[in-house]
């Protein structure tokens, strides 16, 4: 799974809504604490790297900053991905 991290639920939900007619499953979640530490942020969770890149591109087009892209490597273990 891939996690695209946003600073607020407003940004995460806004971008998710741009993909509401997409067949891919996109979920808004609280960012796992192993990624966010103590900060309150939200992420879009997707299965494929390609879909994550598509979401990042849409975020950039709409002027919505992301805090990072992470790949879940094991249960509750994450690696930051350069995009």
Mark where each language-model region is.
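C-terminal structural segments of small proteins and small subunits
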Residues: 51-83
């Amino acid at each position: 799974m891939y996690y695209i991290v946003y600073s607020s639920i407003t940004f995460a939900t806004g971008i998710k809504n741009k993909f509401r007619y997409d067949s891919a499953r996109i979920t808004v979640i609280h960012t796992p604490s192993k990624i966010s530490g103590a900060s309150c942020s939200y992420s879009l969770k997707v299965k494929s790297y390609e879909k994550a890149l598509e979401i990042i591109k849409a975020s950039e087009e709409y002027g919505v900053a992301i805090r990072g892209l992470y790949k879940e490597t094991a249960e509750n273990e994450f690696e930051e991905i350069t995009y």
